[in-house]
Amino acid sequence: MQVLPDIKAPCDALASPSLEPYPQSSITVTLEDMGLWMKFHQIGTEMIITKSGRRMFPQCKIKVSGLIPYAKYLMLVDFVPVDNFRYKWNKDQWEVAGKAEPQLPCRTYVHPDSPAPGSHWMKEPVSFQKLKLTNNTLDQHGHIILHSMHRYKPRFHIVQADDLFSVRWSIFQVFSFPETVFTSVTAYQNEQITKLKIDNNPFAKGFREHGKNTRREGRAKSQKPSPAKGQKRKLPEEKESGAEERDFEKDENVDVKEESNPIVVSSGYPFWISEQNSSHAFPAASPAPAEQREGPAREQQVPTPSYQTYRFHEAGDSQQLPSRDVAALNDFRGRCHPLDLATVPEHDSKQLPEGFTNLPP
């Protein structure tokens, strides 16, 4: 039987002659803080994602060896879904809640030191502490965009290239660790994870005593204002509340005055009776006249055609109306226009000119 030759191209086929003495298989990567990652992994690691972006804890930190000391490399990290499910926290355990959301465009975080010689990456562990996770799909700050309640794992890419523009044609290797799998959440679901974060995260020192943020509480106590200052601050509020009470009492007095002095409508004008109750009210959009705010209601609603004639006598003309005006007024009495209304001052029949007092009922 004939054996087919291996048609797979060797890894160094795309490499330049200077890369041949150092095959890529010699690169090794180990995860730093493995013990801490294992503590979280045994319970079920959770990572907070926010709109503005949140750093990871434990942070992604790796130790690299086997690089070419004088060759330049780029260190990249991306996050891929572990499965196609969405999860929920129910009765102290994670359960499948349904199908995963459509995968978002994959973003890759580039270490800020990239590109750098291999000697630079190998002299100390490579930390991706500035990497942030977000759930903002419109993020423009380069954060990693993830769905909440989904499981992800980070992948570490080591690319031999002089710059980002030549990454596509460069040789690279990908490394991942099962201990770094996590569930993205907007708030911690497992109380044990919360406790582990507080006990091990150096930025959570304020929460370590009885699970409270003692740093914030101490700061609040140190900035507590003195009683004198507190009284001074309350004075304006007391004044404002007193002013509101006086205004409220004033409004009540106005209402009482309106009710205590109802407008008497002459029996000779029966078509006003249906409008009597609404004559005291003004539309909500228009402010009440100044005369109504200052004292009892002195206005009532009357048909518009008599407005000009009535105002004419209010101006001080004490002469008797011409006969044609009286005839026009008598003609108006025979018509009813309840919707065509305006406001004029109310006067007693004793104060009216002689031409009005002699009108027939």
Swiss-Prot record:
Induction details: By FGF-4, activin and retinoic acid.
Main localization category: nucleus
Subcellular location, record wording: Nucleus
Domain of life: Eukaryota
GO cellular component terms, semicolon-separated: chromatin; nucleus
Compositionally biased region (Low complexity): 280-290
UniProt keyword terms in alphabetical order: Developmental protein, DNA-binding, Nucleus, Transcription, Transcription regulation
Region (Disordered): 203-259, 280-323
MF terms in GO: DNA-binding transcription factor activity, RNA polymerase II-specific; RNA polymerase II cis-regulatory region sequence-specific DNA binding
Biased composition regions of type Basic and acidic residues, renumbered to the chain: 206-220, 234-259
Described purpose of this protein according to its UniProt entry: May be involved in regulating somitogenesis.
Protein name as it appears in the record: T-box-containing protein TBX6L
Gene name tied to this protein: TBX6L
